[in-house]
Amino acid sequence: MTGEQLAHWIEESTSTVFFGGAGMSTESGIPDFRSAGGLYTTQHDLPFPAEYMLSHSCLVEHPAEFFDFYRTYLVHPQARPNAGHRALAALERAGQVSTIITQNIDGLHQEAGSRQVIELHGSVHRNRCLACGRAHPLSVIMDAPGVPRCSCGGMVRPEVVLYEESLRSQDLDNATTAISTADLLIVGGTSLNVYPAAALLRFFRGRHLVFINREATGYDRAADLVIHDGLGKTLSAVQRAVMP
């Protein structure tokens, strides 16, 4: 019944926003960070703590180690969009989902066909030279034997948000606008423990707040509907109900 209720709310909504976290991509084989099987708990042979390896300080102080870690654990070229990504893209094409806000950096929403995507933490597919500002494809990062360099000699870094760095103000503004003007907000695959992204929920003033997560979160009681199940299974079922 919960899936049917969500499908009904999507059909009657004039602005549905999906706000997703790492759980959106785990079904594509990309590990998260904080779960029992996540990156922080499974990698013990690193030269520095995992959180430092993902920090601005590490990029500046130990760039070779940073990029070795980044290429090994943050970029997943074998990953493909899963059923949840595809369902959201289909719902967007049908005019039933207006915006996707993601904390993921893998670009799988766009690969599935979604167009209105706000990437709060950036993307592995956007890279730039710190010296001249030139944009570079992911291959420049992946194919470099060590620290990737631009033809000008500057270091090429990924446009992803590292620890000690702030989210882009334009992305935050766009996400705030999308959430504050939505009448249905679907939050999926996130424990809402990462700030400032999690704080965006306070801007929601719409009719229905829905959580889809395998595990309970501390925010469940604030939702109008909670579905403890996989995102791919849930969103596919909802898509079929909305688009028979």
From Swiss-Prot:
Binds 1 zinc ion per subunit. Residues 1-244 form the Deacetylase sirtuin-type domain. Its EC number is 2.3.1.286. Its main location: cytoplasm. The active site is at H121 (proton acceptor). CDD domains: SIR2-fam. It catalyses: N(6)-acetyl-L-lysyl-[protein] + NAD(+) + H2O = 2''-O-acetyl-ADP-D-ribose + nicotinamide + L-lysyl-[protein]. NAD-dependent protein deacetylase which modulates the activities of several enzymes which are inactive in their acetylated form. Belongs to the sirtuin family. Class U subfamily. This is NAD-dependent protein deacetylase.
